[in-house]
Amino acid sequence: RLILTVLFLATGSTAAYAADNFPYGSSLSFAAVRNGQTIGHHRLTFQKSGTQLKVSTEIDLAVKFMGVTAYRYMHRAEEFWNGDTFQSLAAQTDDDGKKTAIRIRRDGAALAVERNARPDVLSPAKFDRGLQRDDSIRTTLPPQLLPSSHWNVRQVRQAALINTQTGAEARVQVSVLGRETIRTANDSIDATRYRYTGDLVMDQWFDDAGRWVKTSF
């Protein structure tokens, strides 16, 4: 079982982050814990300019057995928003050697998706430079879908999300489990716990300001 718990939670101190009641500061960091051991981190950075928002995600996990790394996971993503409207996403993932890359952008009445066709044989060079026209497949998704990148509390009210690793549509059912107190490195936070079932299975906690504070897979 993998648990992500926020290390430090603060609202923005500048006008850019305070505008439109945006609930986060410039960054958000989580410790990733498995069986009581910290195995990595999940970090987000938020860059806001007027109605424009860029969210960058960095995930690094490593599970070790007797001092040897038995499993490694890396994920990098950048998503762009205009107000409440999702505009685009670019993501690359290395899931213990299985490398994938996706790009999603708003295109008229749909979301246009590109992803590499053969993730298990994507070369390091291609992985580093992203998708190329000769090794990608293209699909479309409904325009109202949101990324499954955890930070946006609106995702608990959705019937489907975009899997940010594969670019596929993930159908979900989300139920409210109740209120709990989450301990961070410097505080305790009252939060609501949500349970996802369907194509995504996890529990997620948001505080009263709509800030993501914990996830359990």
Predicted regions and their residues:
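Bacterial N-terminal signal peptides
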Residues: 3-13
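Short, exposed beta-strand-loop hairpins at the edges of beta-sheets
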Residues: 196, 202-207, 211-217
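N-terminal mature ectodomain segment of secretory-pathway/periplasmic proteins
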Residues: 22-113, 210, 215-217
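Solvent-exposed helix/loop surface patches that form functional interfaces
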Residues: 22-25, 90-191, 216
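Tryptophan-centered motif/residue detector
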Residues: 81, 132-133, 151, 205, ...
